[in-house]
């Protein structure tokens, strides 16, 4: 089974939300390694929120601020590749925006070869264009690696009808369609990512990634998180 895991940049950082936290990164490696060892083929799209925040770039034009963010995802991807390999895992980085020794251009034959050798695919640089989120990039890259499931790794155990951090009476919604999520105004992903999921027939699973073992449970079909399906 092929799966694209969407990680936020903040997932790599500690409580301060900046830079790289060794304990947090080691946790990510442990969770990803557990699913690779079970035979799942994994792709990853990571954000850059641990390196750059939109508010810090507010004096720039949006296009240039987005370009800085895209480069931040490359930095995070190179970091992850090194950590994965030092943990005994194979990993390859694909991007359309940079030419570095450790970064390959997106190539479908190369992606298939990497998956056959059980390499983790790390997709850097978003969609390669400004104005698109890493959510949209995750769906696009899932299609390129022929995955029909995107796992959105969050700190919340699924989709709720309102913010559970602000509203104690928030109710979890274990299963819904993209149209329902959009109609309810739920911010699971942005509208462009939703539209692409609907068009391509890709399912999104929202989980609390930081509950140990939840990723593996989700991929094995156990009742964790929330599932958003095409209409």
UniProtKB/Swiss-Prot annotation:
- The positions annotated for binding ATP are 6-9, 49, 53, 154, 160, 163
Family annotation (InterPro entries): AceGlu_kinase-like_sf, Asp/Glu/Uridylate_kinase, Uridylate_kinase, Uridylate_kinase_bac
Per its UniProt entry, which superkingdom is the organism in? Bacteria
**What is any Pfam family matched here?**
AA_kinase
Its Enzyme Commission number(s) read 2.7.4.22
User: Which positions does UniProt annotate for UMP binding?
Assistant: 66, 127-134
Transmembrane helix among keywords: no
Q: Which GO terms describe its biological process?
A: 'de novo' CTP biosynthetic process; UDP biosynthetic process
What catalytic activity is recorded?
A: UMP + ATP = UDP + ADP
HAMAP family linked: PyrH_B (MF_01220_B)
The name of this protein is Uridylate kinase
Q: Which gene encodes it?
A: pyrH
């Amino acid at each position: 089974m092929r799966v694209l895991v969407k990680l936020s940049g903040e997932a790599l950082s500690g409580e301060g939300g900046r830079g790289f936290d060794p304990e947090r990164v080691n946790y990510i490696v442990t969770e990803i390694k557990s699913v690779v060892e079970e035979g799942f083929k994994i792709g990853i799209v990571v954000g850059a929120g641990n390196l750059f925040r939109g508010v810090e770039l507010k004096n720039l034009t949006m296009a240039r601020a987005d370009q800085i963010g895209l480069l931040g995802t490359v930095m995070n991807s190179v970091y992850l590749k090194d950590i994965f390999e030092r943990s005994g895992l194979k990993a390859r980085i694909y991007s359309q925006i940079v030419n570095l020794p450790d970064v390959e251009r997106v190539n479908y034959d190369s992606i298939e070869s990497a998956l056959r050798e059980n390499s983790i695919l790390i997709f850097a640089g978003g969609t390669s264009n400004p104005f698109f989120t890493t959510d949209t990039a995750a769906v696009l890259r899932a299609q390129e690696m022929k995955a029909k499931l995107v796992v959105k790794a969050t700190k919340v155990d699924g989709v709720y009808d309102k913010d559970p951090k602000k509203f104690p009476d928030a109710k979890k919604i274990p299963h819904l369609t993209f149209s329902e999520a959009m109609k309810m105004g739920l911010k699971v992903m942005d509208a462009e990512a939703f539209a692409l999921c609907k068009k391509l027939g890709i399912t999104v699973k929202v989980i609390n990634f930081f509950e140990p073992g939840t990723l593996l449970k989700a991929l094995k079909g156990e009742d964790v998180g929330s599932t958003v399906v095409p209409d």
